[in-house]
Structures are given as C-alpha cells and as structure tokens.
C-alpha cells in the first residue's frame, strides 16, 4: 500500500492505541497461567500472532469486542500440531520460544522474511543451558527454530545488549521449570523498561522473582494467575502524533496515556528538551504538545529503541545538530532502523551521518520525496510525520505495515487535519 502525505498542520485530539508490549505479555502470561480477562488490548497483526501461538500451545483464547478471555495451560503447554508462524513479530517468536521449552516434544517456529533475519542466538544458548534442546535450522541463530522441552532450570548467563525480549521470555516461563533459575546479565541490559513491564505484570499475576537487573532469581514450580487486566495506552505509538504537532508548529492532544512502566514515555522529556511545549495531565491521561522552536540535543537511546525513528524526524526538523547515541540494538529490529532512517531522510534533503551505534543529524528544511517504508511500521509512521513538515508531497511504500502496532494511524492523522491519501 502507498501513502501520500502533503505538508499539513495538525490540530485536535486522538487516543493512543493500546500498548503492543503490554498486550503481548498479557496474552503470554494469561496463557501460561490459570485465567485472564484482558480489557482494551491491541488487536493487531503482531499481537494476533501471539494469540495464534498460544492457542497452539493449548490456551483457550476467546476474543469478543474489546475483551480477550483466556483459560491458560498452567505451565504445561501441549506440543503444537503444526508449525507456529510468528509472521513479522519478534516478540511472538521470542516470548513463545521459552514456552515451547516447557512442552514435552518439539515445536517449530518460522516467520516472514524479515523475522527470519532477526538474531536469537543468546536465547537459543540460554534455553539449551537450561536443559531444553533448541537450534536454528540454518545454524545462524535465526528462525526457523526447533525447540524441544523440557527445560529444567539452573544457572545461566545471557547477553543483555541485543534484545531485552530474551530476558522477558525467560522470566515468563522459568517459574514453571523443575528447578530454581538464576539468570546473570552480561554487558548492559538494553531496553530495560521492557523487562520492568514484564516484571510488573508477573508480579500482578502472583509470580515471585528477585532481581537487581544484573541477576534474576526465579523460584521453580510456581504458577500464576493474571486475572482481570486492562492494557494501558502506548507511548511508542503516541510519539508520532505528538511529534507531528512539534514539527509542524501545531497543537495535538493524545489521550489514554496514564503513568506506567513504559520507557517510551521519555518522548515527553525529549520533546521538552528540544523546545516543544508539553503538558501531561496524569490523572486524565492526556498529553498535549504544542510546537515550539526545536533545537538539537544529545540523546541516549539505550533504553528506548522504538523512539529512534521518531527522534530522527524531530532532529531533522530542529535547528542545529542532534546526536542519537547508544542505539546499535536498533539495527536488529524489523529492519536496520538506523540505516533505514538515514537512507530515507537523506532523500528528503536531511544531512545525516550514520554511526555503528547512532546517528548525527543536522536539522534543516525537508523536501517531499518518494521513500521506502522498509516493511517496518515505525519507519512508515516516522516518515509520515516527516512528510507533514516537508515541502511538497511525500510518498511512502509498504504503508500497510502500520497494522502491526497502530492500525488507525492514517485515519488518526486525517482526523487531525493532515492531508493523507492511502
């Protein structure tokens, strides 16, 4: 699908979609426990892949309107009858890999061409060290993966610098292992807030995990029960309409943004630091951004990788130079997001230098161009925001990928008055 964006002001209000990260975890934790009633989930391509995978493990999942009810497997997943296709969802693949390690038989995972390029080596090693048998069919650490249970627990170490999803995966499944588990983190734990989200939800479900974030200690033979759970709004998705207000000198309010463990709430601090006017009514769950005179800043993206495409566009529209640092792990997402943003913003006239772990961006005037969305929802949405600030028209390919996390994205832009054709 092609999207065409013309220079526009944006005014008004929209609600943030439900959090993709919380929804994935609610489905996985609900499926591994006794029962869950999840209200206000994000039902998108990615999260529905997790629903399908958990059904394959034996969870009874029923979707009705704005509610998902789950009768879980209580730590004893069955062996799937067929290959599990995680589609484009790295979260599905990684969270469910550890679930597969509890099944008394072999599970096969695959995914689309993008997912089959994403690294899983540290998780494969961890599952093997815990007593399961796990390997990549091509020996590359990428899907297709074959996983045979049952993991027993034990003491392992895992690299924390590639993806925090590896750690979240183990935290969800290791409470059901036959022995206690200790996980030692090697190097910096990148994207730590996502692990905090996992721990928050497991604690609500009654699971006991001790940690200082360098070491995780998990008691064996537990079970848990998520019960009733409401999914919060997604700050990652909200970053796009908020940034749209900032780069066009407009005013936008985004609702359904209450305080939570989401690290991507840091977008509000970054907007303030760059010169936008930001007001967050935490009780009402509304964030209002009014564009100001933006200027470049230095940003550490180590804990907020999903904000990098948005931050790159803000930087492109700001005066001076912005340095986005500590972001090498952003290369291992649906696409290499550092390279993708550098490549596409250059087409729009932006001076941008790509480093192994970041971007140096000189702000200036943007010109509409034909750009590639790289089949990546965050690249597409970030480029759409850039198109709102660019002279002329911007044409974006693979626009359908927004269905992964924000299906109503283009409709919401239109609601705010943007000139959008899809």
UniProtKB/Swiss-Prot annotation:
EC number: 2.5.1.19
Keywords linked to the UniProt accession: Amino-acid biosynthesis, Aromatic amino acid biosynthesis, Cytoplasm, Transferase
The protein, known as: 3-phosphoshikimate 1-carboxyvinyltransferase
Organism: Methanocella arvoryzae (strain DSM 22066 / NBRC 105507 / MRE50)
Molecular function as annotated in GO: 3-phosphoshikimate 1-carboxyvinyltransferase activity
Subunit note: Monomer.
Principal place of residence: cytoplasm
Positions contributing to phosphoenolpyruvate binding: 20, 90, 118, 165, 337, 378
Superkingdom of the source species: Archaea
GO cellular component, one term: cytoplasm
Family (UniProt): Belongs to the EPSP synthase family.
Gene3D superfamilies: Enolpyruvate transferase domain
Subcellular location: Cytoplasm
Pathways per UniProt: Metabolic intermediate biosynthesis; chorismate biosynthesis
Database matches in InterPro entries: Enolpyruvate_Tfrase_dom (IPR001986), Enolpyruvate_Tfrase_sf (IPR036968), EPSP_synthase (IPR006264), EPSP_synthase_CS (IPR023193), RNA3'P_cycl/enolpyr_Trfase_a/b (IPR013792)
Function: Catalyzes the transfer of the enolpyruvyl moiety of phosphoenolpyruvate (PEP) to the 5-hydroxyl of shikimate-3-phosphate (S3P) to produce enolpyruvyl shikimate-3-phosphate and inorganic phosphate.
Residue numbers binding 3-phosphoshikimate: 20-21, 25, 163-165, 191, 306, 333
